[in-house]
C-alpha cells in the first residue's frame, strides 16, 4: 500500500507542477446593433444583436452557442434585465479579409464572426436616462499588441440605448464595413 501511495503522490505532483495552463485565447472584437422596433408610451421594444469575432487560427475555443448580456439603467447602474442571445444557425462564419491590394494568408489570419440574436424583442420600461448594454468575456488573443497581458485580459462590449422620449432611435448602420479592423 505504501508503494502504491508513494507512486500516486509522485505522479500527482509531477502532473500538478509540470502541467501547462490552458487559456481561452480567442476573442478579437465585437459590437452591438440595437434596433428600436416600437416606441410605446410606457415601454419600448428593441431587437439586440451581438457580433463577436474570434481568432480561428490561434484560438482554442469555439464560439459559444449562447451569450448572456446585461441591460442597466444609466445613472443608477441598476440591472434592469439580462437577456440570452443565441448564435445564428449554431455556427459562426469566416469573414472575408483583405482587398484587391492585400490578401492575408488564411493559415496565419482567419477571423470567425458569430452573430447572436434574441428569440424575441427586448421590452424595456421607458427610462429618461436610458440604458446601457454590456457583454463581458475572457480572454483576448496574444496577437492583440496594445494590451499588457492579452492572454489574461477579457473584453467588454458596450452600447447605449438613449431615452425613448428622444424618438425612435437605433444604433447607426453603415452597411458592410471592413472586418480587417478586428
Regions from the PLM with identified roles:
Residues 1-28:
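Bacterial Sec-dependent N-terminal signal peptides
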Residues 22-182:
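Long, compositionally biased, intrinsically disordered segments
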Amino acid at each position: 500500500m505504501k508503494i502504491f501511495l508513494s507512486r500516486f503522490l509522485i505522479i500527482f505532483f509531477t502532473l500538478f507542477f509540470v502541467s501547462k495552463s490552458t487559456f481561452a485565447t480567442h476573442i478579437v472584437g465585437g459590437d452591438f446593433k440595437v434596433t428600436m422596433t416600437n416606441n410605446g408610451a410606457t415601454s419600448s421594444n428593441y431587437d439586440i444583436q451581438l457580433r463577436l469575432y474570434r481568432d480561428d487560427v490561434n484560438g482554442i475555443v469555439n464560439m459559444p452557442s449562447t451569450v448572456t448580456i446585461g441591460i442597466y439603467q444609466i445613472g443608477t447602474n441598476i440591472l434592469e434585465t439580462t437577456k440570452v442571445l443565441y448564435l445564428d444557425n449554431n455556427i459562426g462564419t469566416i469573414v472575408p479579409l483583405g482587398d484587391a491590394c492585400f490578401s492575408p494568408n488564411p493559415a496565419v489570419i482567419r477571423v470567425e464572426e458569430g452573430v447572436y440574436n434574441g428569440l424575441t424583442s427586448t421590452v424595456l420600461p421607458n427610462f429618461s436616462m436610458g440604458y446601457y448594454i454590456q457583454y463581458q468575456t475572457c480572454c483576448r488573443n496574444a496577437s492583440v499588441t496594445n494590451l499588457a497581458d492579452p492572454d489574461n485580459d477579457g473584453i467588454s462590449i458596450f452600447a447605449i440605448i438613449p431615452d425613448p422620449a428622444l424618438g425612435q432611435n437605433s444604433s447607426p448602420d453603415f452597411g458592410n464595413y471592413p472586418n480587417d479592423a478586428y
